[in-house]
Amino acid sequence: MQTVSSYGVELRKQNIPVRQTLEIYRSAVSYLTEIYEQVWEKLAEIPDAKRRFNAAEHLVHTTKKNPARFDFDLRFPKMPSYLRRAAIQHALGSVSSYETRMDLWEKSGEKVGKPRLAYENHAMPVFYRDVMYREEKEGKDEAYLKLYDGHDWKWFCVHLNHTDMEYLRRNWSGKKASAPTLEKRHHKYFLRFSYTEEVTLTKTPVKEQIICSVDLGINTDAVCTIMRADGTVLGRKFINHPSEKDRMYRTLGRIRRFQREHGSAQSRGRWAYTKRLNIELGRKIAGAIVKNAEENHADVIVFEYLEMQGKISGKKKQKLHLWRKRDIQKRCEHQAHRKGMRVSRVCAWNTSRLAYDGSGSVSRDLKNHSLCVFQTGKRYNCDLSASYNIGARYFIRELLKSLPVTERSLLEAKVPPVKRRTSCVYADLKELHLQMEILKAA
């Protein structure tokens, strides 16, 4: 399979016309969007995407054999051909999306929510190699970009952030990068490079697999358990970043006090800072999970399928909204695939509520919420028990799925809890493995 990774390299502050280039490109996209909205009925009659694009370009660009219908070349003289085509493609996509949404709205018979075609856009130009972007000699933190200085398109030498370039040389040397895209974040400009890799995911049989089951929590960031198909636990790891969470909760307290006195209108910058802290925390958690799985030679990383719907209320509302569970799983999936590992998800119902030893529901410790008490009186870490159950559910599903129907029915009769994925626990996996060994020996 293919994996696509990207990295943004910061453009160091200097006197180069990046803003003027961005403005003229967005003006071109807006102008083209207006044009293609007018002639969309004729363009829509062309089914082939390539022919439609050629017809759209002929409307605005004059050649020796083709006089243009619209004055795009006069409004935007000497615009590089690749940049012009990128603007055409963006405008065609905007109009096509608008027309599709309009058709769906008209068919639905709704009177509200009418789609609107936005001419003001946030399009970012792509600097195609050789014609818009040239690399400096290897080892130098410089590149050449073709930019618009207000009068003409000229080549400008731009200085790139040394730390970012060192990262690319260290991790992506020898791999081909796509044409960089301009990006603006936090009042800074970046060139984002994308890299495509061919990776082969592991095909280890289920009975020989080693998995890393992960329970994502709010109080503890993540608990990982390394497990075999027979239920043998090879390792456990608690991942927690208390200082990062403390910093984030401290900023949330400041926001709360500020909004109490001044309202929420002026707290936008504070929320943006908190969001960036939360994103960085998600990156660290995902990196730690994948690193632990790789060190233990895991074939699969197993998560809960976390779906939170409905209104969240109460004192934990803010924490739950900032819980980046999907982002962590998405980052882990990308990093795991790059290393050849697979990612799987299991039903999340009752993983924390049921004790891993099969004794039934647990009671949370009132003084320490991370601990729970089993019905046998045993005190145990609740997240660790949940990670055992997550790994067990994965193996129960995969082991039963690969068996013939008659053999599966026989095992389900001997171990009834495995029929329901919402209630099976780690003890059921141990019992299932025992019954499979007995059946194999018979």
Task: Pin down the residues of each PLM region.
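Nucleic-acid substrate recognition interfaces
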Residues: 1-442
